[in-house]
Design a protein with these regions (language model features):
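Outer-membrane beta-barrel transmembrane domain signature of Gram-negative proteins
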Residues: 206-224, 238-312
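Outer-membrane beta-barrel translocator/receptor signature
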Residues: 84-86, 94-149
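N-terminal periplasmic/intermembrane-space "pro-region" immediately following the signal or transit peptide
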Residues: 26-94
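Short sequence motifs at beta-strands and strand-loop junctions characteristic
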Residues: 96-98, 109-111, 141-145, 209-217, ...
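Flexible loop and strand-edge segments within Gram-negative outer membrane beta-barrel domains
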Residues: 138-150, 165-254
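Hydrophobic, lipid-facing positions within transmembrane beta-strands of outer-membrane proteins
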Residues: 100, 113-117, 147-151, 215-223, ...
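Exposed, low-structure sequence patches enriched in small/polar residues
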Residues: 104-105, 315, 319-613
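Surface-exposed extracellular loop regions of Gram-negative outer-membrane beta-barrel proteins
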Residues: 120-138, 271-279, 284, 294-330, ...
Length: 613
């Protein structure tokens, strides 16, 4: 499921409200190595293009990215980064037209719904208010609905900015992974053949119970202060409260504290980043019988001291992450309730040959927070009870290293070649639980339960890969990326493909019409099921996800009428403020395996519009 396109699938031009991302991004938790295949893949480059040092004039406009529309989620460990690097285009001849302050987007399809809203209110002198709302859902058997609303407010003072934010969200979904498989005996081969042919149809007929329908709620409020860019010492301090809850079962109360300080003199920086989270569980129902208070509180602390050099053609960041986790289930060290997990944070980028060749290296590590929210967000279909009472440890990656080159043979083509190595500890391996059933006599069948269990394994992963980015003015963009992985571990490697390929093509036919194709491919994976006695391996078929879309951009309102009557001047046309779009997802109607027993929906579509104001 994590780099991303810096243009939206629908290529919404001029959408503003960057402050929403600015403050909320700082409040985000670190996430483990987990990627999602999305219908709209939004990537942000870690390493910039080879020609990043440029004297050409550029117009930079703030944007807020609309909600990602993700319908097929796969457990691929690392998805190849499909990045649109900022290749040089024609210089700006005229002043850019005034950007829009907000947008609203809505779409309906089968079986999907989508809604987005964002508005940026800036008086030009002092306070800034950003309001946003996002909703996306697919319905039916594989229901998955995500909704989030919130606001951010910033008020500048002479030496610092004061800001606060509040948001809330809901995730509602079905644990629809019920299916049947035949046991090792039956009446005759014809019965087995009948079952193999029709077992998917039988699975769709199994009714969901209330236990299979889950709602998770989140809410957060935070306040912070940050220095303005003119200060010699840059700092940011933020504190907040958040809650993650499954009604009737458990609520996790979180206290989150961030801090960052940076002292700099010209090209040299020395600083530190600090993050602390205290989690307190409020148990309900049958979970209240858990006696040990260690089950009910978990605490995470991270500090990263660093040195950074920022030259004209070289950038170096050298730091070390020092993670300490307290609470039940810390299996990383001999003391089961305490873990200490150091990891490097080193980034290097050097422009070897100006405009056409750079080299980069990233050596990083990561330790999870160990919170219940992180536990459930990694895989919503797992058993929540186990995340509270069973000894477990957040995933720990002591090192994840990558070295690569960006090569620009000519102005519109950018190539990337990279290789890497990662050592990952306590990685989750998903297991489908089955139980005996005699619903379809005379066959003795096994019914899968909707909840997935898990165990931990240590893996090592090598990889080689690359990208091809082609950009012809504003008419064609092509991105082809892929990785091949070399896996080894203390057990067989499950839930992870040996290769991945992503292909994205955007084409502009004229100023109104544009089309795109977004595709993802991955090798087959192994999965496990457990019937209470034996583990069984299953081969999941390769993933093929093909998506396509078309959009029509137009101008409506006074700006459009004024531009038509002013065609003899050099004034640029107003930016399109209305986009109509049609998106066809998974048009091969291939139901890819997400986890064993969980398959993605088949062909589906979205028809909608975006209006910017």
């Amino acid at each position: 499921m994590k780099n991303k396109f810096d243009i939206s699938v629908y290529r919404y031009i001029g959408i503003s409200i960057m402050a929403v991302l600015g403050t909320s991004a700082f409040a985000q938790q670190d996430s483990a190595l987990n990627r999602s295949v999305t219908v709209e893949r939004d990537f942000q480059p870690v390493i910039q293009a080879a020609g990043k040092v440029s004297t050409r004039p550029a117009v930079v406009e703030t944007e807020i990215e609309p909600t990602k529309v993700e319908y097929s989620e796969f457990s691929a460990d690392v998805q190849p980064s499909a990045t649109f690097h900022p290749l040089l285009s024609q210089p700006t001849r005229f002043d850019a037209s005034k950007p829009y302050n907000g947008y609203v987007r809505g779409a309906l399809g089968h079986p999907n719904t989508l809604f987005d809203f964002g508005y940026h209110l800036d008086d030009g002198k002092k306070s800034i208010l950003d309001v946003y709302a996002h909703h996306k859902a697919e319905w039916g058997l594989a229901t998955l609905s995500k909704t989030k609303v919130g606001l951010n407010f910033t008020h500048p003072f002479s030496t610092c900015d004061l800001y606060f934010g509040v948001n809330g969200g809901n995730v509602y979904y079905h644990k629809y992974g019920h299916f049947y498989d035949y046991a090792a005996y039956g009446v005759n081969n014809r019965d087995f053949g009948m079952w193999e042919k029709n077992k998917v149809a039988y699975a769709n007929r199994q009714p969901l119970t209330d236990r299979d329908k889950t709602a998770l709620w989140t809410a957060e409020v935070f306040v912070g202060v940050k220095s303005n860019p003119k200060q010699d010492v840059q700092y940011r301090v933020q504190t907040g409260y958040a809650i993650f809850a499954k009604p009737g079962a458990v609520a996790e109360h979180q206290l989150r504290t961030h801090g960052s300080f940076d002292w700099h003199g010209e090209e040299h920086h020395v600083g530190t980043n600090i993050y602390m989270q205290n989690n307190f569980l409020q148990l309900k129902g049958n979970l209240t019988t858990i006696p040990d208070s260690l089950y009910r509180s978990r605490h995470s602390f991270r500090i990263e001291p660093y040195y950074q050099y920022e030259g004209k053609r070289v950038r170096v960041h050298v730091g070390v992450n020092l993670d300490v986790n307290l609470g039940h289930g810390q299996m990383l060290s001999g003391a089961k309730n305490v873990s200490f997990a150091p990891s490097p944070h080193i980034n290097l980028e050097a422009q070897i040959a100006k405009q056409w060749l750079t080299i980069y290296a990233n050596i990083e590590g990561h330790h999870g927070l160990g919170s219940l929210q992180e536990y459930m967000e990694e895989n919503r279909y797992r058993i929540i009870h186990a995340g509270i009472i069973e000894p477990h440890c957040a995933a720990y990656t002591p090192v994840d290293a990558e070295v690569g080159f960006h090569i620009r043979p000519y102005r519109d083509l950018l190539l990337e070649i990279h290789g890497g190595y990662a050592y990952m500890m306590h990685q989750d391996v998903w297991v489908a639980s089955t139980k005996d059933s005699v619903l379809f006599a005379p066959l003795n069948l096994k019914m899968m339960q909707g909840d997935l269990t898990y165990f931990h394994a240590d893996y090592q992963r090598g990889k080689i890969g690359g990208q091809i980015n082609y950009h012809l003015q504003d008419a064609v963009r092509i991105n082809l990326s892929g990785d091949y992985y070399f896996w080894s571990g203390d057990t067989t490697v499950y839930d992870r493909p040996n290769w991945e390929v992503a292909l994205r093509i955007d084409g502009r036919i004229n100023k109104h019409w544009s089309v795109y194709s977004d595709n993802y491919f991955a090798g087959n994976r192994l999965a496990l099921s457990y019937d209470g006695t034996n583990y069984t391996e299953h081969h999941m078929k390769p993933t093929i996800e093909l998506n396509a879309g078309v959009e029509y951009n137009m101008w409506v309102g006074k700006a459009a009428r004024k531009a038509k009557g002013d065609s003899m001047t050099l004034r640029p046309e107003p930016k399109p403020n209305l986009t109509l779009f049609l998106q066809l997802n998974n048009w091969l109607h291939r139901k890819n395996d997400i986890y064993y027993g969980y398959r993605s929906q088949g062909i589906n579509f979205l028809l909608g519009a975006t209006f910017r104001f």
